[in-house]
Structure formats: structure tokens, C-alpha cells
Amino acid sequence: MAKKNAPSAPADFEQALGELEALVERMEQGELSLEASLAEFERGIALARQCQQALQAAEQKVRLLSGEGEEVPLDTPDAEDGDGE
């Protein structure tokens, strides 16, 4: 049996998520053959992994930008007795 060329990865998170949602909808209709369902499932796993990696990268970037994930209270003693007010 000849293998199909694997579809390329979507360019961004939104495209991958949209494709994954469409794929799930097609599978939920229950009209695909077993072979087609397995191919769609395989594609869905790849898309889910891509989305998860994108989310992890975004979370890491947010943590980096916000000071390594440290919570910073808005009302700090330093801010109240500063010279800027």
C-alpha cells in the first residue's frame, strides 16, 4: 500500500487548532472508513502535539517576560514610599 505524502505543518497555532477542530468534526460524523479514520487520527495527534508545543513556548515566554514567573504584588511598600508621587 502506497503512503500518502504527509501534509505539511500549519504555519501557526491558530491554523493548527482550526485544522484539528475540522478534523474532529469530520471524525465525529462517523462516515469515514477505518483507514481514513486512522489517517485522520494520526494527523490529529500531530496537530495536537504542535498546538501543545506552541502553548508551552508561549507560556515559557510569558514567564520569562514577567520575571521568571514570580508574582509581583501591585501594592508593594517600595512603590508607596517612592519619590515618584
Swiss-Prot record:
Show the ranges annotated as biased composition (Acidic residues).
68-85
Enzyme Commission code(s) on record = 3.1.11.6
Q: Reaction catalysed by this chain?
A: Exonucleolytic cleavage in either 5'- to 3'- or 3'- to 5'-direction to yield nucleoside 5'-phosphates
Question: What Pfam families has UniProt attached to this entry?
Answer: Exonuc_VII_S
Q: Keywords, A to Z? A: Cytoplasm, Exonuclease, Hydrolase, Nuclease
* Molecular functions per Gene Ontology: exodeoxyribonuclease VII activity
What's the top EC group for this one?
hydrolase
Listed InterPro entries: Exonuc_VII_S, Exonuc_VII_ssu_sf
Which Gene3D superfamilies did the record assign? Exonuclease VII, small subunit
**Where is region (Disordered) located?**
66-85
Q: Name one GO biological process term.
A: DNA catabolic process
Highest taxon of the lineage = Bacteria
Classification via HAMAP family: Exonuc_7_S (MF_00337)
Q: Which family does it belong to?
A: Belongs to the XseB family.
- Write the protein's name: Exodeoxyribonuclease 7 small subunit
Which source organism does the UniProt entry give?
Thioalkalivibrio sulfidiphilus (strain HL-EbGR7)
